[in-house]
């Protein structure tokens, strides 16, 4: 990890080239998955059409919204103790989630004929996006990296998670509290314990994607991969949520037209909290928690790197009040940057890992079908 790498060693690709490759790869994957499932890729209830339409719509929306965000002076506050290469990003507008999240929600609702489960997941997604927007707005208003207090943010996340769980409790079959295990015809019955687990998953997933959003194109691309795979997995039991996942995946791709390196806009907490909430909500509603765990491997490692860094620092704190660090900086992607990796090396590597995790998930799903 500490090996010094030149900025483009072993990677002769630009930000737009990487984003285009991802979009092409996911487009081909969507077509292939539709073909394998005997779905018409050009009908609303598919992976391909929602992905394509929302990619285009999100990219077009960005060409109008990004200049508006610039005019409103919503420039991101950059941490001075972070990678020095990030200082040049100062002034890049944030809150990009305000355009690509609504595009996906509207697209999914229309293409699914306003299915009840899509409306519920959309409400949770927008609610978490609202929490992120409040946090982003406070950061901009105070001109610092401090938005709303962590306690307030957590309280809002738990509150919206509880509301979603209440909807699940009264509108879904009783067996939703049993977790399906792949490859075996057995479900782990959790009973009442399912509900605190569900709340934890919603809060943890949203915070994990939030921590991953630290490099141009990183969160948007990895979440797009996870969403498309999750959409394919839930398709047999919930075609409407397949459409939602494909639409949000496409909207992430459209956002990358503006967020790829060098980024013209950041998604901010407005986008990252919403994306994590969406992933968790779909998984809970479709009994796909095992799939979510695998697909979120990158987000969990990023979160664990922060937890390990903080815990080790506190455990090794001496009389002078200073402790030792496991990593040069947390989350992991910043450690890699400070170890000599370029942003494109980190992002492309994480894309490959996300694709491998998606392939593993799809293989497990097909094996258990």
From Swiss-Prot:
Membrane topology annotation: Multi-pass membrane protein
InterPro entries on file: Glycosyl_transferase_4, PNAcMuramoyl-5peptid_Trfase, PNAcMuramoyl-5peptid_Trfase_CS
Signal peptide as annotated in the record: none
GO BP of this protein: cell division; cell wall organization; peptidoglycan biosynthetic process; regulation of cell shape
Documented EC number(s): 2.7.8.13
Catalyzed reaction equations: UDP-N-acetyl-alpha-D-muramoyl-L-alanyl-gamma-D-glutamyl-meso-2,6-diaminopimeloyl-D-alanyl-D-alanine + di-trans,octa-cis-undecaprenyl phosphate = di-trans,octa-cis-undecaprenyl diphospho-N-acetyl-alpha-D-muramoyl-L-alanyl-D-glutamyl-meso-2,6-diaminopimeloyl-D-alanyl-D-alanine + UMP
Enzyme class: transferase
Compartment list: Cell inner membrane
PROSITE patterns: MRAY_1, MRAY_2
Cofactor: Mg(2+)
Transmembrane segment boundaries: 13-33, 49-69, 95-115, 119-139, 154-174, 183-203, 215-235, 237-257, 281-301, 346-366
Function in brief: Catalyzes the initial step of the lipid cycle reactions in the biosynthesis of the cell wall peptidoglycan: transfers peptidoglycan precursor phospho-MurNAc-pentapeptide from UDP-MurNAc-pentapeptide onto the lipid carrier undecaprenyl phosphate, yielding undecaprenyl-pyrophosphoryl-MurNAc-pentapeptide, known as lipid I.
HAMAP family from the UniProt entry: MraY
Record-given protein name: Phospho-N-acetylmuramoyl-pentapeptide-transferase
Gene: mraY
